[in-house]
């Protein structure tokens, strides 16, 4: 009898310790979520303070992965490895909202893209489009098409890339998502430039610049300025090129902003 009681007490203590640890992790993730929009670098440091995220339960680990992806969208650090995002998707596919399922699939596709597994990334993006389309998640449809465009760009299939960027731009425009609309236009212009259609590229980028003037996101405006500067340089219009490239250097980071703005 005493032995049974001792086992029960030990079990309660162990469970209590686990619950306490989980509660601390939940509170920390709440703080990370609040900090992302205000100070994403601080949010990243907070998230990294969880030393062994793989020991979290599936629900909390999935949330940890989602927040890591959102931080990546802000500070352009490396996306999580596929095995972690696969585990996160396993949980969201059963328990998450359609929005969460599509978002985690986008991160998973980007991770496979980073690994160079383009076929797997395309399969995942196709799944994301199916869920987003059924639930009329227009912004997420736009993001997914943008990343599909990146896949085609990586394969030097520029016409196919442009088609996807154009579809993305239409969805962003429809949703009044100014930042992502400007980024999609930037990418259309970039592809035309790669195809030596410099005048058309410039036309698209001037539109992107006028769209970006409506945003307070300096990373977006810097990326448009950088693209314009490069186009003018390719046209040997060096005064204009210098003007836009200097504007980009003075305001932006070293990496271009992502579509999820």
Describe these PLM feature segments.
Residues 1-4:
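Positively charged n-region of N-terminal signal peptides that target proteins for export
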Residues 18-261:
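A "functional boundary" signal
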